Amino acid sequence: AVFIADYLVYDPMSDIYNIEAPVIPVQERHLPEDTRNPIFELAYFRYGLLIAAKWAYELGFTDEASQWHNIAMHIAPLPINDDVYIAHSNCPDTFTNKAIDHPLMLQIYGMLDGYGAEDIVDKDIYRNTLMKVIDVWDYSTLWGWDFAVIAMAAHKLGLDDIALEQLLINSPKNDYVESGNNRQNSRKDLPLYLPGNGSLLLAAARIFNI
């Protein structure tokens, strides 16, 4: 939380905190110098600060708790273009030229849960974003954990049929060996990919309430 609070850049004119360039977002297909306010990082920073503020308050660190909560409440809004969430505020072509790798827009609500994660998400825009990802994203470029991320996004919207479809979809990196480990079968140098297993387990726990 100390790092996040220090890393964010305050704009006194708008009274918001931004993630400024250069930065490499979770979708590592963007030039660091062009990336500003990546959507997942905005949501995750806010999420982390709110958790830290709660813990700090409970431990008696009230000054830190107040500071972190205030920053969380003034983090830049999630970037939107044409009624869908986009990768970052300088990426209006998210769904044309950048529809590859991790669909980080879906992580802001599907993966994050509680601690006000839902407060900054417009459910209609989020649903539009999910459907846009399913429609245009290059699934061959997804990683093993992305399929469960998409499934969790669908589940949060009450679309469990789509969630299960995404968990079971036939795609090069949504593959499992006899041991149960996720593998990226298009990568000879990556026989096992444990983030895929972690994501699958989290999605299953959410969807089946276990």
Q: In which residue ranges do the predicted regions lie?
A:
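Acidic/histidine-rich catalytic neighborhood
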Residues: 2-58
